[in-house]
């Protein structure tokens, strides 16, 4: 099965790191810095995994997760945030109540090994 990652993070340096790790793990990667572009890419990419930053301009991660839930998303979701780690846990609970599969939360800055381990789930 081909693994496809759809990644949205407005901080390019973090998304570049995740993209490099994912490609080394043989993921096909679709990447954007804007939530609206994430929404446009969702059907085309057909992700098996999603990395979703919680705090972005234009739309936050909670709004994107609600959008994903409305579409019946079955991808494994990894929530990342540069803010309080509790924010990621709150987002994980909210996502689960909407039927989404959040497999992990990551706080920025994160280690390469943590990303590698989580993408291997």
For the regions a language model picked out, list residue spans one by one.
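Conserved phosphotransfer cores of two-component systems
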Residues: 43-45, 68-74, 97
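Alpha4 helix (beta4-alpha4-beta5 surface) of REC/receiver domains from two-component response regulators
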Residues: 63, 83-104
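Active-site residues of response regulator receiver
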Residues: 9, 53
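Acidic, metal-coordinating helix/loop segments flanking the phosphotransfer/catalytic sites
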Residues: 31-49
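Two-component/phosphorelay signaling modules centered on CheY-like receiver
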Residues: 12-30
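C-terminal output helix
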Residues: 86-87, 107-119
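Receiver (REC) domain active-site loop signature in two-component systems and cognate sites
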Residues: 56
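Acidic catalytic/metal-coordinating carboxylates
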Residues: 33-34, 60-66
């Amino acid at each position: 099965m081909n693994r496809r990652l759809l990644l949205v993070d407005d901080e390019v340096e973090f998304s570049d790191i995740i993209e490099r790790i994912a490609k080394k793990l043989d993921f096909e990667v679709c990447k954007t810095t804007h939530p609206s572009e994430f929404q446009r890419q969702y059907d085309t990419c057909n992700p098996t995994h999603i990395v979703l930053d919680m705090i972005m301009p234009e739309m936050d991660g909670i709004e994107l997760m609600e959008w994903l839930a409305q579409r019946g998303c079955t991808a494994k979701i990894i929530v990342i945030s540069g803010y309080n780690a509790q924010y990621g846990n709150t987002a994980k609970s909210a996502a689960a109540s909407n039927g989404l599969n959040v497999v992990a939360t990551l706080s920025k800055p994160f280690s390469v090994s943590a990303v590698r381990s989580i993408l291997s789930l």
